[in-house]
Structures are given as structure tokens and as C-alpha cells.
């Protein structure tokens, strides 16, 4: 959502000369900052720290997908599930639905990001379909803890979730699994920004350089369950982290991810008026 930040004026550009450990960071991810966060030609206003995915999770004691899971499994699960069973975040599970429809040949989902009219047409199709499946819904989530609670206490069987919260549950021995979808998981890169009003500038750069060491990168991932942008961080992954990474991204699936495309302001405005409200999802 870099394009949605540019006009706000709340971020300051980084002085890359002060990030002495920038060479430790995946150059392809650093390039995202130069490409998407270089506002007004003043330099990157963002540096990468973590990357992760959004895909399908499930209770292993209640359901198992037929092969790799699909974004369609929260809408038309295979094998089938009776009653309400799923959770997700509204716009991202609807994005997953669009990717699923794209792979079924029902729409060119990625063309939604080209112009207003195409976006509205595609998202109206997605919206109508998702509302028709509202009986599947147990809950919406809005952060990491609600995702965990969905599986532990709310009766969710399958969900479209982030990797981190569910991976941390897997490490704790909970009966859950997370895996990239057959269509390719949604991938994102989270980064660090500097407030335009920041006063503790030197301390901010110290923290960034500390974060960009392989050891700290690895320690961070062992605790939170995402993936590090720091080259060499995997050398400091625990055995449990390495094993789960192989289970989450089997074979060459990590090379088939779907990066979230940049969302211009008009896309966010259209999404606001096209996506269903909580009232639309209410089961009467």
C-alpha cells in the first residue's frame, strides 16, 4: 500500500548511508523500497524486515485437504465440511477468492489493478459469490490473536490466515497446519519506516542495524514464525523452524507465490464501496 502513504506526508526518507548493515538484506526486497516507496524522488521511505504469506490453515484433527489446500477451500472445501466452519479477513479472503476464480478461468483477477472499471466488475462478481457462501463463516479476524482463537476456542476448522500465528501454534504442538495453496499463497513484505516527526533519529538507525544482523534476524523468526529479509538469518533458525518451513512450502512452492500488487488510492476507494459490510454477511 505504498501509494496510499505518499500523500499523507507522515514518513521521512531514509539516509541509506546510516544503514551500515543494508548489505545483509535481500537486494530484491530492498529494491521494493526504491521502486514503490521513493516518494517525490527523495529516496526510499521504507526498508524491508520480514516477509510472510497468507494462505490456508486448518485443524488437523478435523480436516485434511486433498493435496495442497486451495483458496477455494473456505468456500467449497475439498473434502466437504458441514455447517459454519471458516474464518478470514474480509478483503484478503475475497482476494483469495479472486485468485481461485482466476485459476478456474472465471476471470482475469490481476487485471483488477489496472483500472477502476475492471476492478469494480471483478469485485462485484467476487462479492456476490462470497455473500452466497456466508453460511460458511464462523468469524472475521483482524489480527494474530483472533486467528489463534478461531482454532482454539471458536470452532473454526479451516481459515485463510497469515503464516506467523499458525506456525507459532504448530511449534507449540497445537493440532493445526498452515500450507501454501495450489494457486500460490499471497506474499507480502513488511518493513520499517521513519516518522517525519521522529526526534530519536540516531537510536532508530541503531535499531535498524541491529535488526539487520543474521543472528537477530534468525532469533526474530524463531519467536514470531514469519520469514526474515536478512540474508543468512536462516543459519540461525532452530530445527523446529527449519522443519516447519519445509512443511509450509513443500517442493518448489516458495517460488510460486503471488505478491500483493501495489494498490493505488483509487483501488482502496473502490474496495471500500464494493466489498460487503458486516451486515451483508449476517446470517438471518
What are these regions (language model features)?
Residues 127-133, 172-193:
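Periplasmic-binding protein-like
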Amino acid at each position: 500500500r505504498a501509494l496510499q502513504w505518499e500523500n499523507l506526508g507522515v514518513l521521512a526518507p531514509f539516509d541509506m548511508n546510516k544503514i551500515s548493515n543494508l548489505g545483509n538484506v535481500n537486494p530484491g526486497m530492498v529494491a521494493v523500497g526504491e521502486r514503490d516507496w521513493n516518494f517525490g524522488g527523495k529516496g526510499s521511505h521504507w526498508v524491508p524486515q520480514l516477509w510472510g504469506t497468507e494462505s490456508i490453515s486448518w485443524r488437523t484433527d478435523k480436516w485434511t485437504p486433498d493435496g495442497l489446500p486451495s483458496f477455494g477451500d473456505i468456500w467449497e472445501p475439498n473434502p466437504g465440511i458441514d455447517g459454519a466452519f471458516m474464518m478470514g479477513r474480509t478483503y484478503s479472503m475475497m482476494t483469495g477468492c479472486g485468485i481461485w476464480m482466476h485459476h478456474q478461468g472465471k476471470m482475469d483477477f490481476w487485471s483488477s489493478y489496472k483500472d477502476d472499471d475492471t476492478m469494480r466488475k471483478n469485485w462485484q462478481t467476487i462479492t456476490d459469490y462470497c455473500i452466497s457462501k456466508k453460511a460458511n463463516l464462523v468469524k472475521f479476524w483482524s489480527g494474530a490473536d483472533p486467528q489463534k482463537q478461531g482454532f482454539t476456542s471458536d470452532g473454526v476448522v479451516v481459515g485463510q490466515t497469515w503464516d506467523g500465528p499458525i506456525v507459532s501454534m504448530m511449534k507449540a504442538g497445537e493440532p493445526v497446519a498452515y500450507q501454501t495453496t495450489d494457486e500460490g499463497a499471497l506474499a507480502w513484505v513488511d518493513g520499517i519506516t521513519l516518522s517525519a516527526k521522529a526526534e530519536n533519529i540516531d537510536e532508530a538507525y541503531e535499531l535498524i542495524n541491529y535488526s539487520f544482523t543474521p543472528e537477530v534476524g534468525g532469533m526474530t523468526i524463531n519467536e514470531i514464525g514469519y520469514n526474515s529479509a536478512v540474508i543468512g538469518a536462516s543459519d540461525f533458525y532452530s530445527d523446529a523452524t527449519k522443519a516447519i518451513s519445509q512443511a509450509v512450502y513443500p517442493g518448489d512452492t516458495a517460488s510460486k507465490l503471488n505478491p500483493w500488487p501495489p494498490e493505488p488510492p483509487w483501488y482502496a476507494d473502490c474496495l471500500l464501496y464494493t466489498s460487503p459490510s458486516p451486515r451483508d454477511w449476517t446470517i438471518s
